[in-house]
Amino acid sequence: MTASVTDQVALDRIGQIAINVKDLARAVRYYRDTLGMRFLFEVPNLAFFDCGGVRLMLGPAEKPEFDHPGSVLYYKVADINATFAALKGRDVAFIDEPHLIARMPDHDLWMVFFRDSEGNMLGLMSEVRR
């Protein structure tokens, strides 16, 4: 029996992540200047950044049904304490301190959370090898 096209479909790569914003200019400044993300381009009502090969799109919700709190976006960093200190120096409002989430067989998982200029929850994560 031959596999159908639907049997072969697998979502295995994120191409773009959208984050709803109320004030696009303020959000662009925050993601570019405060978080240090690489700005790609802007079109009316939308701005795009590169995040390690995944495109991040900022803009107002296209339709009312899309205007809802989003998922937590986690940025993977090599040194969570150094990144925390650097962003705190840029007045990022952290909700907590870097803390251990889980001990895995070969690494420890650390996280810390903050809100962006639009109130979206963001996180930093670091897998610290032992």
Q: PLM features: what roles do these ranges have?
A:
Residues 24, 73-121:
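Vicinal oxygen chelate
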Residues 38-71, 121-127:
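Conserved short beta-strand elements that form part of the metal-binding/catalytic scaffold
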Residues 25-38:
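Amphipathic alpha-helical segments
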Residues 1-25, 55, 71-73, 126-130:
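N-terminal beta-strand motif that seeds the catalytic metal site of vicinal oxygen chelate
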Residues 36-41, 94-98:
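Short secondary-structure junctions
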